[in-house]
Amino acid sequence: MQEGKNIWSLILAAIRKELSEEEFYIWFENLYFIDATDESIKISAPNSFHKNQVEKRFSKRIKEILTEKGHNTINVEFINPPKEPKTHSMELKNTSLKDISIQQDSPEKRTILNTHTKNIIEHTKHYVIKEDIHTKYRNPFLKKKYTFENFIIGPNNKLAYNASLSIAKNPGKKYNPCLIYGGVGLGKTHLLQSIGNKTEELHKEFKILYVTAENFLNEFVESIKTNETKRFKKKYRHLDMLLIDDIHDLQKKEGIQEELFHTFNALYEDNKQMVFTCDRQPSELINFTDRLKSRFTRGLNVDISKPNFELRVAIIEKKAEEDGIKVPKNILNLVAKKVTTNIRDLEAAVTKLKAHIDLEDIEIDTSIVDKIIKEIIAYENDKTNTNNTINIESIKKVILRELKLTNKDIEGNSKKPEITKARHIYAYLLRNFTELSTIEIGKIIGGKTHSTVLYSINKIDKERNNDLEINNLIIELMNKINKN
Protein backbone atom coordinates (compact mmCIF):
# COMPACT_ATOMS: atom_id res chain seq x y z
CA MET A 1 0.00 0.00 0.00
CA GLN A 2 2.68 2.51 1.04
CA GLU A 3 4.83 1.65 -1.97
CA GLY A 4 1.82 2.29 -4.21
CA LYS A 5 1.34 5.72 -2.62
CA ASN A 6 5.01 6.50 -3.16
CA ILE A 7 4.82 5.52 -6.82
CA TRP A 8 1.73 7.71 -7.33
CA SER A 9 3.61 10.59 -5.69
CA LEU A 10 6.48 10.09 -8.16
CA ILE A 11 4.02 10.23 -11.05
CA LEU A 12 2.45 13.45 -9.75
CA ALA A 13 5.84 15.07 -9.22
CA ALA A 14 6.91 14.26 -12.79
CA ILE A 15 3.67 15.47 -14.38
CA ARG A 16 3.60 18.67 -12.30
CA LYS A 17 6.89 19.72 -13.94
CA GLU A 18 5.37 19.33 -17.40
CA LEU A 19 2.07 21.18 -16.89
CA SER A 20 1.09 24.72 -16.03
CA GLU A 21 -0.16 25.28 -12.49
CA GLU A 22 -3.75 25.69 -13.69
CA GLU A 23 -3.66 22.60 -15.90
CA PHE A 24 -2.20 20.44 -13.12
CA TYR A 25 -4.86 21.68 -10.69
CA ILE A 26 -7.72 21.02 -13.11
CA TRP A 27 -6.79 17.42 -13.84
CA PHE A 28 -4.86 16.12 -10.82
CA GLU A 29 -5.93 18.03 -7.70
CA ASN A 30 -9.09 15.95 -7.31
CA LEU A 31 -7.55 12.54 -7.96
CA TYR A 32 -6.97 10.39 -4.88
CA PHE A 33 -5.02 7.22 -4.16
CA ILE A 34 -7.33 4.32 -3.23
CA ASP A 35 -5.44 1.05 -3.16
CA ALA A 36 -2.46 -0.79 -4.64
CA THR A 37 -1.34 -4.32 -5.45
CA ASP A 38 1.83 -5.63 -7.05
CA GLU A 39 0.23 -5.15 -10.47
CA SER A 40 -1.88 -2.01 -10.18
CA ILE A 41 -2.57 1.29 -8.46
CA LYS A 42 -6.18 2.44 -8.12
CA ILE A 43 -6.88 6.17 -8.31
CA SER A 44 -10.28 7.74 -7.68
CA ALA A 45 -11.64 10.45 -10.00
CA PRO A 46 -14.53 12.73 -8.93
CA ASN A 47 -16.80 11.72 -11.84
CA SER A 48 -16.90 9.73 -15.08
CA PHE A 49 -16.17 12.78 -17.25
CA HIS A 50 -13.04 13.59 -15.25
CA LYS A 51 -11.96 9.94 -15.29
CA ASN A 52 -12.34 9.66 -19.08
CA GLN A 53 -10.51 12.92 -19.74
CA VAL A 54 -7.54 11.99 -17.54
CA GLU A 55 -7.28 8.58 -19.20
CA LYS A 56 -7.45 10.15 -22.65
CA ARG A 57 -4.94 12.91 -21.95
CA PHE A 58 -2.41 11.35 -19.59
CA SER A 59 -2.49 7.52 -19.62
CA LYS A 60 0.30 7.26 -22.18
CA ARG A 61 2.53 9.71 -20.31
CA ILE A 62 1.87 7.98 -16.97
CA LYS A 63 2.95 4.66 -18.50
CA GLU A 64 6.14 6.32 -19.77
CA ILE A 65 6.90 7.69 -16.30
CA LEU A 66 6.36 4.28 -14.72
CA THR A 67 8.81 2.77 -17.20
CA GLU A 68 11.35 5.53 -16.56
CA LYS A 69 11.10 4.91 -12.81
CA GLY A 70 11.51 1.14 -13.19
CA HIS A 71 7.86 0.22 -12.51
CA ASN A 72 6.87 -0.90 -16.02
CA THR A 73 4.90 -3.91 -14.70
CA ILE A 74 2.50 -1.68 -12.77
CA ASN A 75 -0.72 -0.34 -14.27
CA VAL A 76 -2.58 2.78 -13.05
CA GLU A 77 -6.35 2.29 -13.00
CA PHE A 78 -8.71 5.27 -12.70
CA ILE A 79 -12.09 4.58 -11.12
CA ASN A 80 -15.18 6.56 -10.19
CA PRO A 81 -15.84 7.10 -6.45
CA PRO A 82 -17.81 4.26 -4.84
CA LYS A 83 -21.51 4.87 -4.32
CA GLU A 84 -22.84 4.98 -0.79
CA PRO A 85 -24.75 1.85 0.34
CA LYS A 86 -28.43 2.64 0.77
CA THR A 87 -28.39 1.55 4.41
CA HIS A 88 -25.86 4.22 5.26
CA SER A 89 -26.62 6.95 2.73
CA MET A 90 -28.76 9.11 4.99
CA GLU A 91 -26.34 8.75 7.89
CA LEU A 92 -23.42 9.93 5.78
CA LYS A 93 -25.41 12.63 4.02
CA ASN A 94 -26.30 14.34 7.27
CA THR A 95 -22.91 14.00 8.92
CA SER A 96 -20.14 16.58 8.84
CA LEU A 97 -16.57 15.63 7.96
CA LYS A 98 -15.50 16.12 11.55
CA ASP A 99 -18.21 13.74 12.80
CA ILE A 100 -17.22 11.12 10.24
CA SER A 101 -13.60 11.07 11.38
CA ILE A 102 -14.77 10.69 14.99
CA GLN A 103 -17.03 7.78 14.03
CA GLN A 104 -14.17 6.09 12.22
CA ASP A 105 -11.99 6.17 15.33
CA SER A 106 -14.77 5.23 17.77
CA PRO A 107 -14.57 1.56 18.95
CA GLU A 108 -18.32 1.06 19.05
CA LYS A 109 -18.76 2.53 15.59
CA ARG A 110 -15.84 0.56 14.19
CA THR A 111 -17.62 -2.71 14.89
CA ILE A 112 -20.59 -1.84 12.70
CA LEU A 113 -18.71 -0.27 9.80
CA ASN A 114 -18.06 -2.76 7.04
CA THR A 115 -15.13 -2.46 4.65
CA HIS A 116 -17.16 -0.73 1.94
CA THR A 117 -18.41 1.94 4.31
CA LYS A 118 -14.87 2.58 5.52
CA ASN A 119 -13.86 3.18 1.93
CA ILE A 120 -16.68 5.71 1.62
CA ILE A 121 -15.41 7.53 4.70
CA GLU A 122 -11.91 7.64 3.24
CA HIS A 123 -13.26 9.21 0.05
CA THR A 124 -15.64 11.49 1.94
CA LYS A 125 -12.67 13.22 3.55
CA HIS A 126 -11.77 14.48 0.11
CA TYR A 127 -14.92 15.48 -1.69
CA VAL A 128 -18.23 15.17 0.19
CA ILE A 129 -19.74 18.60 0.75
CA LYS A 130 -21.11 19.19 4.22
CA GLU A 131 -24.75 20.18 4.05
CA ASP A 132 -24.99 21.90 7.41
CA ILE A 133 -22.49 24.64 6.50
CA HIS A 134 -21.01 26.17 3.36
CA THR A 135 -17.76 24.60 2.26
CA LYS A 136 -15.02 26.86 0.93
CA TYR A 137 -15.21 26.90 -2.87
CA ARG A 138 -11.64 26.27 -3.98
CA ASN A 139 -10.66 28.50 -6.86
CA PRO A 140 -7.41 27.60 -8.64
CA PHE A 141 -7.37 30.74 -10.75
CA LEU A 142 -7.39 33.25 -7.89
CA LYS A 143 -3.78 34.33 -7.39
CA LYS A 144 -2.87 35.45 -3.89
CA LYS A 145 -0.35 37.95 -5.26
CA TYR A 146 -3.21 40.21 -6.39
CA THR A 147 -4.39 42.29 -3.44
CA PHE A 148 -5.80 45.74 -2.80
CA GLU A 149 -2.79 46.42 -0.59
CA ASN A 150 -0.27 46.15 -3.44
CA PHE A 151 -2.42 47.91 -6.04
CA ILE A 152 -0.96 51.35 -6.78
CA ILE A 153 -3.69 53.99 -6.74
CA GLY A 154 -3.70 57.07 -8.95
CA PRO A 155 -6.17 59.47 -10.58
CA ASN A 156 -6.64 57.05 -13.48
CA ASN A 157 -7.90 54.15 -11.37
CA LYS A 158 -9.08 55.55 -8.04
CA LEU A 159 -12.80 55.21 -8.77
CA ALA A 160 -12.38 51.62 -9.99
CA TYR A 161 -10.30 50.81 -6.91
CA ASN A 162 -12.84 52.27 -4.47
CA ALA A 163 -15.74 50.51 -6.18
CA SER A 164 -13.88 47.18 -6.17
CA LEU A 165 -13.04 47.44 -2.47
CA SER A 166 -16.65 48.33 -1.66
CA ILE A 167 -17.87 45.27 -3.59
CA ALA A 168 -15.50 42.97 -1.69
CA LYS A 169 -16.73 44.32 1.65
CA ASN A 170 -20.44 44.28 0.75
CA PRO A 171 -21.02 41.91 -2.18
CA GLY A 172 -24.40 41.99 -3.89
CA LYS A 173 -25.39 45.30 -2.30
CA LYS A 174 -24.44 48.55 -4.07
CA TYR A 175 -22.68 47.86 -7.35
CA ASN A 176 -24.17 44.78 -8.95
CA PRO A 177 -23.24 44.06 -11.62
CA CYS A 178 -19.98 45.95 -11.99
CA LEU A 179 -18.00 46.24 -15.21
CA ILE A 180 -14.41 47.54 -15.17
CA TYR A 181 -13.19 48.57 -18.60
CA GLY A 182 -9.96 49.93 -20.07
CA GLY A 183 -7.00 49.08 -22.27
CA VAL A 184 -4.59 46.18 -21.97
CA GLY A 185 -2.27 46.04 -18.97
CA LEU A 186 -3.88 48.79 -16.90
CA GLY A 187 -4.80 46.72 -13.82
CA LYS A 188 -8.27 45.34 -14.55
CA THR A 189 -7.29 41.75 -13.76
CA HIS A 190 -5.45 42.89 -10.62
CA LEU A 191 -8.61 44.55 -9.31
CA LEU A 192 -10.86 41.65 -10.32
CA GLN A 193 -8.62 39.14 -8.55
CA SER A 194 -8.31 41.44 -5.54
CA ILE A 195 -12.10 41.47 -5.24
CA GLY A 196 -12.08 37.67 -5.15
CA ASN A 197 -9.26 37.42 -2.62
CA LYS A 198 -10.65 40.07 -0.27
CA THR A 199 -14.18 38.62 -0.45
CA GLU A 200 -12.78 35.19 0.33
CA GLU A 201 -11.03 36.68 3.36
CA LEU A 202 -14.07 38.57 4.67
CA HIS A 203 -16.82 36.12 3.69
CA LYS A 204 -15.33 32.67 4.18
CA GLU A 205 -18.62 30.90 3.47
CA PHE A 206 -18.92 32.42 -0.03
CA LYS A 207 -18.63 30.38 -3.20
CA ILE A 208 -16.45 32.59 -5.42
CA LEU A 209 -15.39 31.79 -8.96
CA TYR A 210 -12.92 33.74 -11.10
CA VAL A 211 -12.66 32.70 -14.74
CA THR A 212 -11.50 34.23 -18.00
CA ALA A 213 -14.15 34.61 -20.68
CA GLU A 214 -12.17 32.26 -22.89
CA ASN A 215 -12.12 29.52 -20.24
CA PHE A 216 -15.84 30.10 -19.64
CA LEU A 217 -16.42 29.58 -23.38
CA ASN A 218 -14.19 26.51 -23.62
CA GLU A 219 -15.83 24.89 -20.61
CA PHE A 220 -19.26 25.52 -22.11
CA VAL A 221 -18.24 23.97 -25.44
CA GLU A 222 -16.77 20.95 -23.64
CA SER A 223 -19.97 20.51 -21.62
CA ILE A 224 -21.99 20.33 -24.85
CA LYS A 225 -19.63 17.74 -26.35
CA THR A 226 -19.86 15.54 -23.26
CA ASN A 227 -23.57 16.09 -22.51
CA GLU A 228 -22.65 17.79 -19.23
CA THR A 229 -24.54 21.08 -19.73
CA LYS A 230 -26.58 20.55 -16.55
CA ARG A 231 -23.38 20.31 -14.55
CA PHE A 232 -22.10 23.49 -16.23
CA LYS A 233 -25.29 25.42 -15.42
CA LYS A 234 -25.30 24.20 -11.82
CA LYS A 235 -21.68 25.22 -11.35
CA TYR A 236 -22.18 28.79 -12.53
CA ARG A 237 -25.70 29.49 -11.28
CA HIS A 238 -25.12 28.48 -7.66
CA LEU A 239 -22.36 30.93 -6.80
CA ASP A 240 -22.23 33.85 -4.39
CA MET A 241 -19.80 35.75 -6.61
CA LEU A 242 -18.91 35.37 -10.29
CA LEU A 243 -15.86 37.19 -11.70
CA ILE A 244 -15.36 37.01 -15.49
CA ASP A 245 -12.23 38.53 -17.05
CA ASP A 246 -12.03 39.88 -20.64
CA ILE A 247 -15.71 39.66 -21.51
CA HIS A 248 -14.92 41.12 -24.96
CA ASP A 249 -13.57 37.67 -25.93
CA LEU A 250 -17.21 36.55 -26.21
CA GLN A 251 -17.91 38.86 -29.16
CA LYS A 252 -19.35 36.98 -32.16
CA LYS A 253 -20.04 33.95 -29.95
CA GLU A 254 -23.85 33.80 -29.89
CA GLY A 255 -24.23 30.47 -28.09
CA ILE A 256 -22.16 31.39 -25.07
CA GLN A 257 -23.75 34.85 -24.93
CA GLU A 258 -27.12 33.15 -24.58
CA GLU A 259 -25.79 30.98 -21.76
CA LEU A 260 -24.21 33.98 -20.01
CA PHE A 261 -27.50 35.88 -20.28
CA HIS A 262 -29.38 33.16 -18.39
CA THR A 263 -26.55 32.75 -15.87
CA PHE A 264 -26.61 36.51 -15.31
CA ASN A 265 -30.36 36.51 -14.67
CA ALA A 266 -30.18 33.58 -12.25
CA LEU A 267 -27.46 35.22 -10.15
CA TYR A 268 -28.96 38.71 -10.33
CA GLU A 269 -32.35 37.53 -9.09
CA ASP A 270 -30.64 35.97 -6.07
CA ASN A 271 -28.62 39.15 -5.36
CA LYS A 272 -25.36 37.37 -6.10
CA GLN A 273 -22.44 39.61 -7.01
CA MET A 274 -21.09 39.73 -10.57
CA VAL A 275 -18.04 41.65 -11.78
CA PHE A 276 -16.74 41.71 -15.35
CA THR A 277 -13.76 43.28 -17.10
CA CYS A 278 -13.67 44.45 -20.69
CA ASP A 279 -11.30 46.33 -23.01
CA ARG A 280 -14.07 48.77 -23.99
CA GLN A 281 -17.43 50.16 -22.88
CA PRO A 282 -20.38 47.76 -23.30
CA SER A 283 -21.86 49.97 -26.03
CA GLU A 284 -18.73 49.43 -28.15
CA LEU A 285 -18.89 45.63 -28.09
CA ILE A 286 -19.31 44.19 -31.59
CA ASN A 287 -21.77 41.36 -32.34
CA PHE A 288 -22.87 41.31 -28.73
CA THR A 289 -26.58 40.90 -27.96
CA ASP A 290 -28.30 44.11 -26.90
CA ARG A 291 -30.05 42.45 -23.98
CA LEU A 292 -26.69 41.34 -22.57
CA LYS A 293 -25.22 44.81 -23.06
CA SER A 294 -28.19 46.24 -21.18
CA ARG A 295 -27.51 43.84 -18.30
CA PHE A 296 -23.95 45.14 -18.01
CA THR A 297 -25.09 48.77 -17.94
CA ARG A 298 -27.69 47.97 -15.26
CA GLY A 299 -25.02 48.34 -12.59
CA LEU A 300 -21.78 50.32 -12.31
CA ASN A 301 -19.47 50.81 -15.30
CA VAL A 302 -16.11 52.26 -14.34
CA ASP A 303 -13.04 52.82 -16.48
CA ILE A 304 -9.28 52.65 -15.92
CA SER A 305 -7.19 54.94 -18.11
CA LYS A 306 -3.45 55.11 -18.77
CA PRO A 307 -1.32 56.06 -15.74
CA ASN A 308 0.04 59.60 -15.53
CA PHE A 309 3.76 60.34 -15.07
CA GLU A 310 3.69 60.28 -11.26
CA LEU A 311 1.88 56.95 -11.18
CA ARG A 312 4.27 55.49 -13.76
CA VAL A 313 7.20 56.46 -11.55
CA ALA A 314 5.54 54.79 -8.54
CA ILE A 315 4.88 51.62 -10.55
CA ILE A 316 8.51 51.40 -11.69
CA GLU A 317 9.80 52.00 -8.15
CA LYS A 318 7.58 49.26 -6.76
CA LYS A 319 8.56 46.74 -9.44
CA ALA A 320 12.26 47.53 -9.00
CA GLU A 321 11.93 47.02 -5.25
CA GLU A 322 10.18 43.67 -5.79
CA ASP A 323 12.95 42.57 -8.18
CA GLY A 324 15.66 43.69 -5.79
CA ILE A 325 17.36 46.23 -8.05
CA LYS A 326 18.24 49.87 -7.52
CA VAL A 327 17.26 52.16 -10.37
CA PRO A 328 18.91 55.60 -10.42
CA LYS A 329 16.47 58.49 -10.37
CA ASN A 330 17.40 59.71 -13.86
CA ILE A 331 16.88 56.22 -15.32
CA LEU A 332 13.59 55.82 -13.49
CA ASN A 333 12.30 59.14 -14.82
CA LEU A 334 13.49 58.31 -18.34
CA VAL A 335 11.55 55.04 -18.41
CA ALA A 336 8.46 56.73 -16.95
CA LYS A 337 8.67 59.48 -19.54
CA LYS A 338 9.12 57.20 -22.56
CA VAL A 339 6.92 54.20 -21.70
CA THR A 340 3.41 55.66 -21.55
CA THR A 341 1.36 52.68 -22.71
CA ASN A 342 0.42 50.61 -19.66
CA ILE A 343 1.52 48.99 -16.40
CA ARG A 344 2.52 45.76 -18.12
CA ASP A 345 5.03 47.54 -20.36
CA LEU A 346 6.45 49.50 -17.42
CA GLU A 347 7.00 46.29 -15.46
CA ALA A 348 8.47 44.61 -18.55
CA ALA A 349 10.99 47.45 -18.82
CA VAL A 350 12.12 46.87 -15.23
CA THR A 351 12.35 43.10 -15.83
CA LYS A 352 14.57 43.73 -18.86
CA LEU A 353 16.74 46.08 -16.81
CA LYS A 354 17.16 43.34 -14.22
CA ALA A 355 18.08 40.84 -16.94
CA HIS A 356 20.86 43.13 -18.19
CA ILE A 357 22.16 43.59 -14.64
CA ASP A 358 22.05 39.88 -13.78
CA LEU A 359 23.21 38.39 -17.07
CA GLU A 360 25.72 40.96 -18.27
CA ASP A 361 26.91 42.22 -14.87
CA ILE A 362 26.85 45.85 -15.95
CA GLU A 363 25.59 49.13 -14.59
CA ILE A 364 22.50 50.56 -16.22
CA ASP A 365 22.98 53.65 -18.36
CA THR A 366 20.77 55.62 -20.72
CA SER A 367 21.95 53.71 -23.82
CA ILE A 368 20.65 50.42 -22.41
CA VAL A 369 17.40 52.07 -21.38
CA ASP A 370 16.95 53.53 -24.87
CA LYS A 371 17.40 50.05 -26.38
CA ILE A 372 14.84 48.52 -24.02
CA ILE A 373 12.34 51.29 -24.66
CA LYS A 374 12.73 50.89 -28.44
CA GLU A 375 11.99 47.16 -28.10
CA ILE A 376 8.84 47.84 -26.10
CA ILE A 377 7.61 50.60 -28.41
CA ALA A 378 8.35 48.44 -31.49
CA TYR A 379 6.37 45.57 -30.01
CA GLU A 380 3.41 47.82 -29.21
CA ASN A 381 3.51 49.29 -32.71
CA ASP A 382 3.54 45.78 -34.16
CA LYS A 383 0.41 44.93 -32.20
CA THR A 384 -1.29 48.17 -33.23
CA ASN A 385 -0.47 47.76 -36.90
CA THR A 386 -1.40 44.08 -37.00
CA ASN A 387 -4.75 43.26 -38.60
CA ASN A 388 -6.51 40.23 -39.99
CA THR A 389 -4.86 40.60 -43.41
CA ILE A 390 -1.99 38.70 -41.82
CA ASN A 391 -3.20 35.15 -42.31
CA ILE A 392 -2.22 31.84 -40.80
CA GLU A 393 -0.23 30.74 -43.84
CA SER A 394 1.99 33.83 -43.81
CA ILE A 395 2.81 33.24 -40.13
CA LYS A 396 3.56 29.58 -40.76
CA LYS A 397 5.71 30.45 -43.79
CA VAL A 398 7.93 32.72 -41.70
CA ILE A 399 8.19 30.17 -38.87
CA LEU A 400 9.20 27.34 -41.21
CA ARG A 401 11.68 29.46 -43.14
CA GLU A 402 13.37 31.23 -40.24
CA LEU A 403 13.48 28.25 -37.87
CA LYS A 404 14.32 25.79 -40.66
CA LEU A 405 11.45 23.40 -39.97
CA THR A 406 8.95 21.36 -41.97
CA ASN A 407 5.16 21.11 -41.79
CA LYS A 408 5.58 17.73 -40.11
CA ASP A 409 7.78 19.30 -37.42
CA ILE A 410 5.42 22.13 -36.57
CA GLU A 411 2.20 20.08 -36.67
CA GLY A 412 3.55 16.80 -35.29
CA ASN A 413 4.31 15.47 -31.82
CA SER A 414 8.10 15.49 -31.78
CA LYS A 415 9.56 16.00 -28.30
CA LYS A 416 12.84 17.46 -29.58
CA PRO A 417 13.47 20.68 -27.58
CA GLU A 418 14.03 22.87 -30.64
CA ILE A 419 10.81 21.68 -32.30
CA THR A 420 8.79 21.94 -29.08
CA LYS A 421 10.08 25.51 -28.65
CA ALA A 422 9.10 26.32 -32.25
CA ARG A 423 5.54 25.09 -31.62
CA HIS A 424 5.35 27.31 -28.52
CA ILE A 425 6.45 30.29 -30.63
CA TYR A 426 4.00 29.41 -33.43
CA ALA A 427 1.11 29.32 -30.94
CA TYR A 428 2.25 32.63 -29.42
CA LEU A 429 2.43 34.37 -32.81
CA LEU A 430 -0.95 33.01 -33.92
CA ARG A 431 -2.42 34.37 -30.71
CA ASN A 432 -0.88 37.81 -31.25
CA PHE A 433 -1.54 38.18 -34.97
CA THR A 434 -5.03 36.69 -35.21
CA GLU A 435 -8.30 36.56 -33.29
CA LEU A 436 -8.22 32.76 -33.15
CA SER A 437 -9.22 31.08 -29.88
CA THR A 438 -6.86 28.65 -28.18
CA ILE A 439 -9.04 25.76 -29.38
CA GLU A 440 -8.75 26.98 -32.99
CA ILE A 441 -4.98 27.44 -32.62
CA GLY A 442 -4.73 23.92 -31.20
CA LYS A 443 -6.38 22.47 -34.31
CA ILE A 444 -3.84 24.27 -36.51
CA ILE A 445 -0.88 22.96 -34.50
CA GLY A 446 -1.60 19.28 -34.88
CA GLY A 447 -4.70 18.95 -32.70
CA LYS A 448 -3.30 20.32 -29.46
CA THR A 449 -5.66 20.95 -26.51
CA HIS A 450 -6.71 24.33 -25.16
CA SER A 451 -4.54 23.79 -22.07
CA THR A 452 -1.48 22.93 -24.15
CA VAL A 453 -1.87 26.02 -26.34
CA LEU A 454 -2.43 28.25 -23.31
CA TYR A 455 0.70 26.82 -21.69
CA SER A 456 2.71 27.59 -24.88
CA ILE A 457 1.48 31.18 -25.05
CA ASN A 458 2.14 31.86 -21.36
CA LYS A 459 5.57 30.23 -21.56
CA ILE A 460 6.77 32.44 -24.42
CA ASP A 461 5.20 35.53 -22.84
CA LYS A 462 7.15 34.84 -19.63
CA GLU A 463 10.40 34.02 -21.44
CA ARG A 464 10.25 37.29 -23.38
CA ASN A 465 10.58 39.14 -20.11
CA ASN A 466 13.47 37.04 -18.82
CA ASP A 467 15.42 35.91 -21.89
CA LEU A 468 16.86 38.57 -24.19
CA GLU A 469 17.64 36.03 -26.92
CA ILE A 470 14.04 34.80 -27.06
CA ASN A 471 12.69 38.34 -26.96
CA ASN A 472 14.92 39.40 -29.87
CA LEU A 473 13.88 36.32 -31.85
CA ILE A 474 10.17 37.09 -31.36
CA ILE A 475 10.67 40.72 -32.42
CA GLU A 476 12.58 39.58 -35.52
CA LEU A 477 9.86 37.07 -36.46
CA MET A 478 7.12 39.67 -35.93
CA ASN A 479 8.93 42.13 -38.20
CA LYS A 480 9.28 39.49 -40.92
CA ILE A 481 5.61 38.51 -40.63
CA ASN A 482 4.57 42.15 -41.00
CA LYS A 483 6.76 42.51 -44.11
CA ASN A 484 5.83 39.14 -45.60
Curated annotation (Swiss-Prot):
Residues 358-484 are annotated as: Domain IV, binds dsDNA. One of its GO terms (biological process) is DNA replication initiation. The keyword Phosphoprotein does not apply. The keyword Nucleotide-binding applies. ATP binds at G185, G187, K188, T189. Residues 1-73 are annotated as: Domain I, interacts with DnaA modulators. Residues 73-140 are annotated as: Domain II. GO terms for cellular component: cytoplasm; plasma membrane. Its main location: cytoplasm. InterPro entries: AAA+_ATPase, Chromosome_initiator_DnaA, Chromosome_initiator_DnaA-like, Chromosome_initiator_DnaA_CS, DnaA_C, DnaA_dom, DnaA_N_dom, DnaA_N_sf. It is found in: Cytoplasm. It comes from the Bacteria. GO terms for molecular function: ATP binding; ATP hydrolysis activity; DNA replication origin binding; lipid binding. Residues 141-357 are annotated as: Domain III, AAA+ region. Keywords: ATP-binding, Cytoplasm, DNA replication, DNA-binding, Lipid-binding, Nucleotide-binding. Domain I is involved in oligomerization and binding regulators, domain II is flexibile and of varying length in different bacteria, domain III forms the AAA+ region, while domain IV binds dsDNA. Plays an essential role in the initiation and regulation of chromosomal replication. ATP-DnaA binds to the origin of replication (oriC) to initiate formation of the DNA replication initiation complex once per cell cycle. Binds the DnaA box (a 9 base pair repeat at the origin) and separates the double-stranded (ds)DNA. Forms a right-handed helical filament on oriC DNA; dsDNA binds to the exterior of the filament while single-stranded (ss)DNA is stabiized in the filament's interior. Belongs to the DnaA family. Oligomerizes as a right-handed, spiral filament on DNA at oriC. This is Chromosomal replication initiator protein DnaA. The gene is dnaA.
